[in-house]
Amino acid sequence: MAMKIRLARGGSKKRPFYRIVAADSRMPRDGRFIEKLGTYNPLLPKDSEERVKMDAERVQYWLGQGAQPTDRVARMLEAAGLREKAERNNPKKGTPGKKAQERAEEKAAKAAAPAEEEAAAE
């Protein structure tokens, strides 16, 4: 059975409230789940302790059983210190794109041209 630790939406329209649950990945998002592990209320301030509540012991148990947290739940677990932060490798993120590199080269060429003229005049 492929287990997931994920959010199941509750609450009324425009007033979301989520349960953090351990569920079979083939079940519907708000459908049958095996165990409720906690709650998440996005309407509360980010620094509120009531915003995310979870039973750390049961979460560790399900992670030990091979349950995979969804991306959002994984972030919550990292913030709570229940899981190590996943390293992401994106080496090209910091490098400028082709057009930005061309603009930088043109700017450098324009800046170098007057300096060369001054050196030749002396």
Swiss-Prot record:
Residue span of region Disordered: 81-122
Biased composition regions of type Basic and acidic residues, renumbered to the chain: 81-90, 99-109
Gene Ontology biological-process entries: translation
Domain of life of the source: Bacteria
Keyword list, A-Z: Ribonucleoprotein, Ribosomal protein
Record-given protein name: Small ribosomal subunit protein bS16
SUPFAM superfamilies: Ribosomal protein S16
Entry similarity comment: Belongs to the bacterial ribosomal protein bS16 family.
